[in-house]
Amino acid sequence: MAKDEKKAALDAALKKIEKNFGKGAVMRMGEKADTQISTVPTGSLALDAAIGVGGYPRGRIIEVYGPESSGKTTVALHAVAEVQKRGGTAAYIDAENAMDPAYAEALGVDIDSLILSQPNTGEEGLQIADTLISSGAIDIVVVDSVAALVPRAEIEGEMGDAHVGLQARLMSQALRKLSGTISKTKTIAIFINQIREKVGVMFGNPETTPGGRALKFYSTVRLEVRRAEQIKQSGDVLGNRVKIKVVKNKVAPPFKVAEVDIMYGKGISQSGELLDMAADKDIIDKAGSWYSYKSDRIGQGRENAKKYLEEHPDIYQKVQEQVRQAYGIDEKSIADRENPEKIKEKREETSEENKTDNSEKTK
């Protein structure tokens, strides 16, 4: 077949595919307009840097897992707050029935506009998530947690009944359906997960996450959250030093670690992580226990230096700008990648497609 004939045959095939499956079903890679990754900040500057693209990528699945009381829900709620600050809509599927509105509000979440669901079964929770995402009106949905998405058969059965692999099959089926919709609507889907231990493992890591392997495969970013040490002052425990490891990353190099302070009742200490990041890049000098900025001492000891930054917003802002530039996560580049108008147009297109599909099914 000659070159011109091949081109004509390919064009005819592409037109046929577009006619049958709709515009955009197939395209040349160079034709795609939104080649850059659109992101939303995580609420932690250190985590933005660790993920490598300045925040959570839109239209992707994120898994946040770790031991109990390590800070998983706090990490997710900070993401919800960041989305709402930018005028987005957030949904929270509280399968654990443990949502604390007062704590969420302290982290900056607008609880009046937050869409909350406390489903009775795993099927109900995932169906609600699917319906919300398919609407094209949700910017972020958090499922807390995968381990609490109990299949209906287990809820209705007797205590002690064996339901081998039921939750894994449920998650596998749900993610097959959700992944495409999440991508089209540019929704960030955060799945919080717990840790279990495999029985009889002698060598290697015995820890695993419930819900089967599907979530591991479909996740673009997987974050492991672990407590490192307690933060104490004058004998009182104020919070925990937490390590967030990027164990999987499809948008940037993985295995980077963000260390943050999670303070009781306040969430992630942004002044603390800013101080650490600035000290690492020599923006703030550290000599012994003293911290200095441009030859001016700002505090003896980490907690005093943090307090100084919080009490001097002008210096805080200057240091933050320098840190963003040093780590390549300045807000302008993130805003350029987000391109809100394109995201809005894409959502409207998806919403119209869903309406058309539903009307055709009704006929």
Swiss-Prot record:
ATP binds at residues 66-73. GO terms for cellular component: cytosol. Pfam families: RecA (PF00154), RecA_C (PF21096). One of its GO terms (molecular function) is ATP-dependent DNA damage sensor activity. Keywords: ATP-binding, Cytoplasm, DNA damage, DNA recombination, DNA repair, DNA-binding, Nucleotide-binding, SOS response. Its main location: cytoplasm. This is Protein RecA.
